[in-house]
């Protein structure tokens, strides 16, 4: 039939990840953004985990860490007025979700291209000076409705549905 066939095993070792306790930069301002409208990405993750048999609730928040050199309030007001970091028609600044049986995971990209682009836009297009650093991440809030919290969280993290370990 012309198709070469070999008899061997394939193996793949996933890279291991470490969960670190998040320590906010004391010199930075955190903005936690919630959505007014339905978050389709969180709904999809919730649905996929439900199909895997997990009785959990999922919400997602966007996390911005904004470092400025001085004039913090003035700079933050300018950033807010641009609408670059969130769309005030669909989103609003809130607090990190806290609830019983809930764990929150801040996930950041290794190459944070989105925050780099927003930083350039704020400093060049909007000419806001004194922004020293901008970091973006996603906070996944996982509420375990039934079962052992730690065991279920470990299983969910091992699915890599909340982040790409590579």
What are these regions (language model features)?
Residues 1-166:
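Non-catalytic terminal accessory/regulatory regions of metabolic enzymes
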């Amino acid at each position: 039939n012309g198709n070469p066939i070999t008899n061997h095993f394939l193996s793949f070792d996933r890279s291991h990840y470490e969960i670190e306790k998040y320590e906010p930069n004391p010199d930075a301002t955190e903005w936690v953004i919630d959505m007014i409208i339905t978050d389709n990405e969180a709904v999809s993750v919730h649905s996929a985990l439900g199909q895997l048999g997990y009785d959990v609730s999922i919400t997602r928040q966007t996390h911005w860490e904004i470092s400025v050199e001085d004039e913090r309030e003035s700079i933050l007001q300018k950033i807010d007025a641009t609408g670059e970091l969130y769309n005030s028609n669909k989103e609003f600044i809130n607090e990190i979700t806290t609830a019983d049986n809930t764990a929150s995971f801040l996930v950041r990209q290794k190459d944070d291209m989105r925050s780099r682009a927003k930083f350039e836009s704020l400093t060049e297009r909007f000419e806001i000076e004194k922004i020293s650093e901008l970091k973006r991440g996603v906070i996944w809030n996982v509420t375990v409705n039934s079962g052992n919290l730690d065991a279920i969280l470990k299983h969910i993290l091992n699915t890599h549905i909340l982040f790409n370990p590579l």
